């Protein structure tokens, strides 16, 4: 199987920005955002998760295309496409591919002290577990000293959840949470373009590792 016969359906959660920079221009406002007391972030201390998700996903798309993979975005640049619609798009694209996966990019939110990276699959043992492990191992290698939040209770590093993006498609699917934007230190990393590129490259390398194990020819 050639890389261009392997399809990645790429998802970025939540909405983007309409023309402007204020919070009222953020499609998902007042959800999926926070205003930190200091620092500029996206605008006057505001961090907008959907904007971050799109930036990281765009870098990931380019690295995957550089490997020769097919990539189909299932999100819009600005609008917050419904979960059902995004799953339907992924399913439609997958029908024409020899092999397909779904990767959903997110930032996390919790208490101000929560930090780090984690990745989710649907419950049970599936190929999604291997995909999550391949990506997770690359992210952990690429970010020494950062907080990693694996769950090895079932002998792999992913966590399990019944998120729509994971259960609404038949293909292997993972959802990565790339830092807590509610934590000031994590948000400072997440807004940095070089850090986004590092995380995106790690995702791409992990996807390549998985694809090779599924029969993709790579030198």
Model-identified regions with their sequence ranges:
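Active-site-proximal helix/loop segments of hydrolytic enzymes
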Residues: 2-7, 44-219
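Active-site-proximal loop motif in hydrolases
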Residues: 7, 12-56
